[in-house]
């Protein structure tokens, strides 16, 4: 795990690489394809609101992030292979752990999933 401050330098290219799923695909919220879309939105949000993430990190110094995010950020390349394998619970914890999840991230994630034809359903 690494702090957000150590992953900031290369955020720019990460949001571009999520492969689109076929139209009208229904997946579990913990499906890796859903996680990759969520992480793409998350990284894009970090880039767009870097100061807020720095302030959040300063207020929560023990909050850590999966090292794969840092590796993807610093590589500047296709991040999908780097971010595969991050457990769904870690993806959820990182993304929902910021105060702006409900107002900014959740709507952006819903939009990105819909654009890729991905709909989520909680398994019974």
From Swiss-Prot:
Residues 1-20 form the signal peptide. It is found in: Secreted, Cell wall. Its main location: secreted. O-glycosylated. The keyword Transmembrane helix does not apply. One of its GO terms (molecular function) is structural constituent of cell wall. GO terms for biological process: fungal-type cell wall organization. GO terms for cellular component: extracellular region; fungal-type cell wall; fungal-type vacuole. Pfam families: SRP1_TIP1 (PF00660). Component of the cell wall. This is Seripauperin-23. It comes from Saccharomyces cerevisiae (strain ATCC 204508 / S288c).
């Amino acid at each position: 795990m690494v702090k957000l401050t150590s992953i900031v330098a290369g955020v720019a290219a990460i949001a571009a690489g999520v492969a689109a799923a076929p139209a009208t695909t229904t997946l579990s919220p913990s499906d890796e394809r859903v996680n990759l879309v969520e992480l793409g939105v998350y990284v894009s949000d970090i880039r767009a609101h870097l100061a807020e993430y720095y302030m959040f990190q300063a207020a929560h110094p023990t909050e850590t992030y999966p090292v794969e995010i840092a590796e993807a950020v610093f590589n500047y390349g296709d991040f999908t292979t780097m971010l595969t394998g991050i457990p769904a619970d870690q993806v959820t914890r990182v993304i929902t752990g910021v105060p702006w999840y409900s107002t900014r991230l959740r709507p952006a994630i819903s939009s990105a999933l819909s654009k890729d034809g991905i709909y989520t359903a909680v398994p019974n």
